[in-house]
């Protein structure tokens, strides 16, 4: 992790591409630091490192049944792919792609993270990963349903998976907080 001690009242920001902080799973020292009052900000694809890691509050699936359903659907897709044609591979890839979609995010504008905004915010969605809502903490920005896609290209398979997904939120961890922002919010 880090060779220096970080005071508990500090903040660490982990952005997309900042892999030197966390290589695979977040180290125990990072969780200890957050639990002691630190604030960790995780942005974009960096969130993948925190999925299903104990103490960080970010899950890949809403429930065990949702996880089983996703695995069944993935297996069905793999079986269908056996019959696909080589010439259609690029077109097939588009079904699961996001190339910059403008989405309408519903906000809890009573939370400090969204203070001053209306009840919605338009976000540039660049990541195809969709996260379920946090079970502990605050779900401040939520992608409600497929009609939330306002403009741009989003593959139909990703679009149909949109159902109350986290865009940004805050996980309360003992004395500290982990702030998740799934895409760059500077749009």
Outline where the language-model segments fall.
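Short alpha-beta junction capping motif
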Residues: 2-50, 175, 181
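Generic marker of "main functional regions" within proteins
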Residues: 11-12, 40, 44, 50, ...
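Catalytic beta-strand/loop cores that center a nucleophilic Ser/Cys/Thr
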Residues: 81-187
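Cysteine-nucleophile active-site neighborhood
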Residues: 29-77, 84-86, 93
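Short, basic, helix/turn surface patches
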Residues: 2-12, 21-25, 68-79, 89-98
């Amino acid at each position: 992790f880090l060779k220096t001690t970080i005071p508990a009242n500090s903040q660490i920001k982990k952005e997309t591409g900042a892999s030197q902080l966390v290589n695979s799973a977040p180290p125990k020292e990072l969780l200890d630091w957050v639990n002691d009052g630190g604030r960790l900000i995780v942005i974009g694809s960096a969130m993948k490192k925190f999925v299903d890691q104990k103490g960080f509050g970010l899950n890949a699936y809403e429930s065990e049944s949702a996880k089983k359903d996703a695995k069944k659907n993935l297996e069905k897709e793999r079986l269908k792919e056996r019959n696909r044609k080589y010439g259609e591979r690029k077109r097939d890839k588009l079904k699961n792609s996001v190339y910059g979609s403008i989405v309408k995010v519903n906000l809890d504008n009573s939370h400090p993270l969204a203070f001053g905004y209306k009840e919605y915010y338009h976000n540039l969605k660049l990541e195809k990963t969709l996260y379920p809502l946090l079970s502990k903490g605050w779900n401040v920005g939520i992608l409600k349903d497929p009609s939330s896609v306002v403009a741009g290209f989003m593959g139909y398979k990703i679009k149909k998976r949109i159902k109350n997904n986290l865009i940004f939120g805050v996980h309360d961890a003992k004395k500290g907080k982990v702030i998740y922002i799934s895409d760059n919010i500077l749009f």
